[in-house]
Amino acid sequence: MSPALYSAAKSVLFQMNPETAHKVTLWGLRLAEKMRVLPLVMGEVPSDPVEILGMKFPNRVGLAAGMDKEADTVSAFGQAGFGFVEVGTLTPRPQPGNEKPRLFRLIPQKAIINRMGFNNEGIAAGVENIRSATRFHGVLGVNIGKNKITPNEDAAQDYLTCLRAAWPVADYIAINFSSPNTPGLRDLQAAEPAARLLASLKSEQSNLAAETGRHVPIFMKVAPDVTDEHIAELSRVFLDEGLDGLIATNTTLSRVGVEANPRHEEAGGLSGAPLTERSTEVIGAFASELKGRIPIIGVGGIMNGVDAVAKIKAGASLVQLYTGFVYRGPDLIRECVEAMKAECPVHR
């Protein structure tokens, strides 16, 4: 899709309530995919294949969790040119999320604040949607979380329930324990709770692999609001417990860079351009601690190809888009793939 065409579409979508615009966009993508015109509209994305943890990615640019919460637009996003698609966050039981309004654009700052709260129809419905995506043949990640009503001491059971349900359909499973929009969730990022949770997940991963004959890597998604000491502690946990992969980062509670926008006082996680630098710093800090033993997916404020390259140079193996995709459209996928291919070629 040309930048001019997306700009015209965005001018219409940005007249709508953000959550309505999101739903309309997903509906339009599904319709175009069903009519088999999506590849023509989106244009071709260059090939830049890479293999990580046994998964073969056609390129290194993925869709971050939160865009396709219900996993009902998987095939369309695959045809849009993404090298991989991560759906969710999905929870054991359906839940409505937080009260509306809960999604806000900060247009001058190219940012979004959301306090969605894991609104979804539940893991069973999500898995059924994935099974229906028969025209999707790419790498699929399933992002899972706990229900709001589940106390933290029982959180592991929620994650285990989702792990078991997602196992047959996922290429990798991402543990969301860093969203700022579920009360107390980030407490699980402390070293001891994180170690207990990861140990439970790795034990069940071994059981499921033995039962099914297939290995599904487990990733954990971390917040950007962490100190260097916390990064070092979590890195030791991840290495000791055998984490397969890391996703850095989730949205931030910081409002640095958006103070002038009247929306900056809205509660929730901030994403987009104001997060670019901090997320890259966190990727670099984790990469320094992990020393290449755990691959990193870099996400947070990728608004152009330069940002994507910076994430790779900081230590990420793959990147994901969300807010940049909202503001730039599908052309951003191609730009990032081309930039990384030129500046950070894969050693084959």
Swiss-Prot record:
The protein's assembly and partners: Monomer.
Entry note: cofactor: Binds 1 FMN per subunit.
Function recorded in the entry: Catalyzes the conversion of dihydroorotate to orotate with quinone as electron acceptor.
Primary location: membrane
Binding site for substrate: K69, N114, R115, M116, G117, F118, N176, N181, N250, T251
Pathway(s) where this gene product acts: Pyrimidine metabolism; UMP biosynthesis via de novo pathway; orotate from (S)-dihydroorotate (quinone route): step 1/1
EC number of the protein: 1.3.5.2
Biological process annotations from GO: 'de novo' pyrimidine nucleobase biosynthetic process; 'de novo' UMP biosynthetic process
Keywords recorded for this protein, A-Z: Cell membrane, Flavoprotein, FMN, Membrane, Oxidoreductase, Pyrimidine biosynthesis
Domain of life: Bacteria
NCBIfam families: PRK05286.1-1 (NF003644), PRK05286.1-2 (NF003645), PRK05286.1-4 (NF003646), PRK05286.2-5 (NF003652), pyrD_sub2 (TIGR01036)
The family this protein is said to belong to: Belongs to the dihydroorotate dehydrogenase family. Type 2 subfamily.
Residue sites binding FMN per the record: A65, G66, M67, D68, K69, T89, N143, N176, K221, T249, G272, G301, Y322, T323
Annotated protein name in UniProt: Dihydroorotate dehydrogenase (quinone)
Protein topology in the membrane: Peripheral membrane protein
One GO location term (cellular component): cytoplasm
Enzyme class: oxidoreductase
Family matches, as InterPro entries: Aldolase_TIM, DHO_dehydrogenase, Dihydroorotate_DH_1_2, Dihydroorotate_DH_2, Dihydroorotate_DH_cat, Dihydroorotate_DH_CS
Gene name linked to the record: pyrD
Reaction(s) catalysed (UniProt annotation): (S)-dihydroorotate + a quinone = orotate + a quinol
Cofactor list: FMN
